[in-house]
Swiss-Prot record:
The lineage of its organism: Bacteria, Pseudomonadati, Pseudomonadota, Alphaproteobacteria, Rhodobacterales. PANTHER family: UNCHARACTERIZED PROTEIN YQGE, UPF0301 PROTEIN YQGE. One of its GO terms (cellular component) is cytosol. Belongs to the UPF0301 (AlgH) family. This is UPF0301 protein SPO0296.
Amino acid sequence: MDLTGKLLIAMPGMGDPRFERSVIFLCSHGEDGAMGLIVNKPADLNVSTLLEQLEIPSSSAAAARAPVRLGGPVEMARGFVLHSPDYAGKLQSLKVSDGFVMTATLDILEDIARDNGPARAALMLGYSGWGPGQLEAEIGDNGWLTADADPDIVFGSRDDGKWEAALKLLGIDALLLSASAGHA
């Protein structure tokens, strides 16, 4: 089962507080493990502040307001931009699926600062990673649900409500979801 390009939705009984109510976009998934980006955990800075810290001049009003998110607990000083496929990065862009591309170079930040970036983008610091078989075991233990990725959830600017919206993709009302899970 290849879950690349899908959403992981944390179940209410998620034992790890770093992933409580998380929605994660899976950038890669295979026999060597999985890598994803949390799309609904805000960082304590916005893109404008990050551009200042990186000494990248910005003339973009949109970048000034754009949030930065915590993509996960691994390599939190490393940045990733998940974006729409309309942007053709110069180097190292990974097409994840038809509607999503990931770029991890400064080029995209410079282009975003000049309003030459992708139409839709989400910037994350750090990522979430799983070793071989680890994610499958967590799914089997009812830690995660999976759903098709929705660009409005992934790229939406408001983080509150993304978890509930992701559950609705599966026809699930968050208020009716139990923190306890069983196996039939």
